Amino acid sequence: MKLAIFDYGAGNIFSLRIALEKQGASVDVINNFDAANNYSGLLLPGVGNFDPAIRSIRDYSSTSFSDYVKDKTPVLGICLGMEMFFEKSEEGKEKGLAVMEGEVVLLPNKFKIPHMGWNNIKIKKSNPLLDGVPDSSWVYFVHSYRVKPKNPDIVVADSDYGIDVPAVISKGNLYGTQFHPEKSGKIGSTMLQNFLRECKK
């Protein structure tokens, strides 16, 4: 199976690539969507900043992201990658990918920002990405923003950081994690395995 990681040109995606290859996937790094349909799945990694990442997706592909996801290829957005699914973000001025309704907001300044380190997740509903993942599992976060979906039903797990932070979202062929599964040990590996299984369907 061959997967694609989209490279915004913003930083190191080596750990994500290695984590996927350990699960038996062949991985290419791409910088536009024009050949993305050649892959069984796509990952939007969690490195970079909102505006430059959005521009890299919008400006270097003749195929729009919204048209690409209509193909039903599974897409996993990690941290920033998940945040870009929404319509706008307080981190930047660019419009988001808008494949999900809602916005991205800064964590309240009464909390330590960024939220960095291990925290557990509360599973709200079953989801293919969470098969074999026990409730209250610990995963690794590094983020300063949280998503506010217009439809709360897409949130399948959240995390308590003084406020509820959507930790896992799912809508159709789109999956998102606010945390980094590639840095979350055995639990993260299980989630990546689950994503690969969805890509095989």
Predicted regions and their residues:
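Acyltransferase
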Residues: 177-201
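Beta-strand-turn-beta hairpins that frame and shape the catalytic cleft
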Residues: 136, 170-174
